[in-house]
Amino acid sequence: MNATNDSKDINITRIYDAPLKAVWDAWTDPAQVAQWWGPRGFSLTTHSKDLRSGGHWHYTMHGPDGTDYPNRTDYLEVAPQSRLVYDHGANDDRPPMFRVTVEFTEVNGKTHMEMCMSLPSVEAAADARKFIKQAGGDATWDRLAEYLAMRVSNEDKFYINRSFEAP
């Protein structure tokens, strides 16, 4: 996580040892997102996901203490396997907390992810940095890397199951 303390933006850059399509699918397929989104100890239930400009993702984060956190993401731009722009942290009772821009590029079979979280003020960004640190820092992005490593390694496996009756 990079940013100066006088910035309202928080920038995150990661390189994933996985092809672009695998990273994009992990971000956009509700079943895959549930495997890695959020801090360690949290789980996720997607209620609906309309991945298009003007679409919404309704989901609930389930905390390790049993607390539920209803969320809504509002998609502003969806460029398949390239870019997502969305407003994050809304629910039925509150407006979005910040805007996120994520760009994906593939270089030599690895995927570069550039993310910028734009908060409404320097103070809001400072509060977000503090919250992210308390919630485990970059744990979400580490979980994505772990999920992709497992997923990509399993794609190379081929299983044959056969049963027969022996005399």
Which ranges hold each PLM region?
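Hydrophobic ligand-binding cavity/cleft-lining segments
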Residues: M1-S43, A166-P167
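A generic structural micro-feature
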Residues: T4-D6, K49-L51, D65-Y69, D92-P96, ...
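Intrinsic-disorder/low-complexity, polar/charged segments enriched in Ser/Thr/Lys/Arg/Asp/Glu/Gln
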Residues: S7-T13, L20, H56, P70, ...
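A short, structured loop/turn motif at beta-sheet edges
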Residues: L20-K21, L51-R52, L76-S82, E103-H112
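Hydrophobic pocket/interface hotspot
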Residues: V23, V33, W57-Y59, Y75, ...
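Glycine-rich portal/gate segments that line the openings of hydrophobic small-molecule binding cavities
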Residues: T45-D87
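Beta-strand/loop substructures that line and gate deep hydrophobic ligand-binding cavities in soluble
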Residues: V85, A90-D138
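A conserved amphipathic terminal alpha-helix motif
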Residues: L119-P167
